[in-house]
């Protein structure tokens, strides 16, 4: 095992900094692997999960630390079959409550989608395998139908002189399952099991394609969303519209630019450094520090349904300050205590129990002995 000093000497400050950040985050875990909404402890567990999410972001001063942790958790979930059933449940629940929301808030849909499907596989195995089987039953028929639509849309867009990449994609299992549960429907009653995605070069092209599509297919009222004019809080942008297909079956189309697609797939990671191709020549574009900070400020707006504007502004203020008004600490049982700025070890002790505070004689912070009023 290498010390931080040895790590720094061998690999440099940057690598040591990342390892230190990832090491600190390894202690983050939920202490209870079950969360039944009817359980009297459900509210406490949800509060603990929210504290853990905030602590996760507050501790990771470098966004790359979070990206490493997400990649590490994805690897853990992919190899979860080798764990005991109890460990599978605990890790999957922890992933669903902590890591999936963080991937969502960072806009990294590729990781979020795979994590959600893997969580469903271990938390709701009966529903998962039943859904997999039912989706597979009509796969050939559905693929033929999707390809026919894609070919038609390609022709319409090409005839208008717009350069575009067009393809069909299946919705992931957890999103289908969530819709079935929320809408109390069977899979046969869920019509949008797939979507057609259209990638173009410019924003004007997005709206031009939308006009073409609405001319060729009848749009369903109330099913159009303009996330280009009004991006989601994680910076996701696209035009979404649901239409009636040739056979009368509804289908969804998403229209976005290549840059929007990169953001939708990789979120904040796409905005650090990425390769562009201009006339066949690869170039590297690096986002400025100001743009990074602007991005971070926006993604830290927690995606929650606020009961009023005051509640939203209070939450927004704390997030824009990167949780600078909070001190997070672990109890011996693994719970997270969210304390006000300026709190000392003695405050933490009393937050656990008055008996703990009364008997406290010393404290250790980040591995070092400190006074109780540190």
Per-region residue spans from a language model:
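Ubiquitin-like/PB1-type beta-grasp interaction modules and other compact soluble beta-rich domains
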Residues: 307-341, 346, 351-374
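Active-site helical microenvironments for divalent-metal-assisted chemistry
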Residues: 1-195, 200-251, 256-320, 325, ...
